[in-house]
Amino acid sequence: MALSREEVAARYGAALFGYAQDNKVLDNVYDEMMELKKAVIATPQVISVLSDPILNSKDKKDFLTAIEKNFSEEVQGFLNLLLEYDRFAYLVDIIDQFAVLYDDKNKIASGTATTAVKLDDDQLKRLGDGFAKKYNLNTVRLENKVDPSILGGVILQVKDRVIDGSVKNKLKKIRAQIIDEN
């Protein structure tokens, strides 16, 4: 029975995480995998070539060797494993699963700060730091999404938590309170 895309990503992501952790190179492997993800998203032909069933394995290996020369031995070995087992089509999903495990271990969360106007990097960092402190996390990485309809304030969405401090939401609550009183 064939494994689903999610199952392949979970297995290989967990295997890479365990291997990197056991060999005490987790942070380095994480950094390299994030760089690799950026590169293959910018150049999707890399995955197409390495997943192409028509190309012979020697040509794929030669192509991979040219790409992987800047990576550590651990990452090179992992990429060769993906090539050997014909799993390169799942690379981005595997990296995403690896990143989830890395973030969980390091108490890192990612989320969105929705505001009426764009926030600068310092404001995003302070929001993230405040959320991290409140919820016992080491780091919260926030992406800023601009939505003028919230009028002001901020809506924070991190993992399964939503904190709606928008002016729109406060006005909605005041309106509901006035209606309830009448």
From Swiss-Prot:
Q: Which Gene3D superfamilies match?
A: N-terminal domain of the delta subunit of the F1F0-ATP synthase
Give a GO cellular-component term: plasma membrane
Membrane topology note? Peripheral membrane protein
Give the source's domain of life in one word: Bacteria
What keywords would UniProt list here? Answer: ATP synthesis, Cell membrane, CF(1), Hydrogen ion transport, Ion transport, Membrane, Transport
> Key word Protein transport present in the record?
no
Q: Tell where it localizes.
A: Cell membrane
Task: Name the Gene Ontology molecular function terms of this record.
Answer: proton-transporting ATP synthase activity, rotational mechanism
Q: Which Pfam families match?
A: OSCP
User: What role is this protein assigned?
Assistant: F(1)F(0) ATP synthase produces ATP from ADP in the presence of a proton or sodium gradient. F-type ATPases consist of two structural domains, F(1) containing the extramembraneous catalytic core and F(0) containing the membrane proton channel, linked together by a central stalk and a peripheral stalk. During catalysis, ATP synthesis in the catalytic domain of F(1) is coupled via a rotary mechanism of the central stalk subunits to proton translocation. This protein is part of the stalk that links CF(0) to CF(1). It either transmits conformational changes from CF(0) to CF(1) or is implicated in proton conduction.
* NCBIfam families found in the cross-reference section: ATP_synt_delta (TIGR01145), PRK05758.2-4 (NF004403)
* Quaternary state and interactors: F-type ATPases have 2 components, F(1) - the catalytic core - and F(0) - the membrane proton channel. F(1) has five subunits: alpha(3), beta(3), gamma(1), delta(1), epsilon(1). F(0) has three main subunits: a(1), b(2) and c(10-14). The alpha and beta chains form an alternating ring which encloses part of the gamma chain. F(1) is attached to F(0) by a central stalk formed by the gamma and epsilon chains, while a peripheral stalk is formed by the delta and b chains.
Family in the record: Belongs to the ATPase delta chain family.
Its name, as the record gives it, is ATP synthase subunit delta
Q: Lineage of the native species?
A: Bacteria, Bacillati, Bacillota, Bacilli, Lactobacillales
Name of the coding gene: atpH
